[in-house]
Amino acid sequence: MPDDLGALYTINRASTPGVGSEASAEGLKRWIDLSTCLVAADADDHPLGFITLIEPGTLAYESANLRWFEAWQKTASCDLIYVDRIAVAAHARGNGIGEALYRAVFEISAGRQFLGAEVNTVPDNPGSHRFHQRLGFKDVGRRRYASTYEVAYYVREI
């Protein structure tokens, strides 16, 4: 992972505001270190995209979105894992990388009930809404944090 960190940070920056903005590669590393991180790479082992998964109850992960899913999980009496972010390099988009990352997550999450993800509605990220809906995610809630930031919460049965 340390060798890939610079490339993952570049992918993350190019994907903002669709994913959380980080001020530095070390800022991104902080979240990666708390997560399960899967990386898709090309034949030369250059990263094309990545997805990070956070276990509910990870208190070191300071995220109102994770806290929302923890409350939803408790209300629904279910087992869930949270997608912190999925990001694909601009030149690799439209080639199935994001779907391949999610398919890998579905495999390693066997035995879990749900996968949770949030998608921006303000600023809107219509491509991500379509992508998640196409993969079977259902909208289960929304939250407005500010006039410039609102999210939709999606879950998918695994």
Enumerate the language-model features and the residues they cover.
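Conserved acyl-donor/pantetheine-binding loop and adjacent beta-alpha core of acyl/acetyltransferases
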Residues: T52-R85
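C-terminal "cap" of GNAT-fold acetyltransferases
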Residues: R144-I158
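Active-site rim helix/loop that mediates acceptor-substrate recognition in acyltransferases
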Residues: P17-A43, T52
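A short beta-loop-alpha structural element at the N-terminal edge
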Residues: M1-L8
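Conserved acetyl-CoA-binding loop-helix of GNAT-fold acetyltransferases
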Residues: V88, G94-E107, R130, R134
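Conserved active-site alpha-helix within GNAT-family acetyltransferase domains
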Residues: E99, V122-R142
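Conserved GNAT acetyl-CoA-binding A-motif
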Residues: I81, I108-V122
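Conserved beta-strand-loop-alpha-helix junction that forms the acyl-donor binding cleft
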Residues: A90-R93, G116-H129
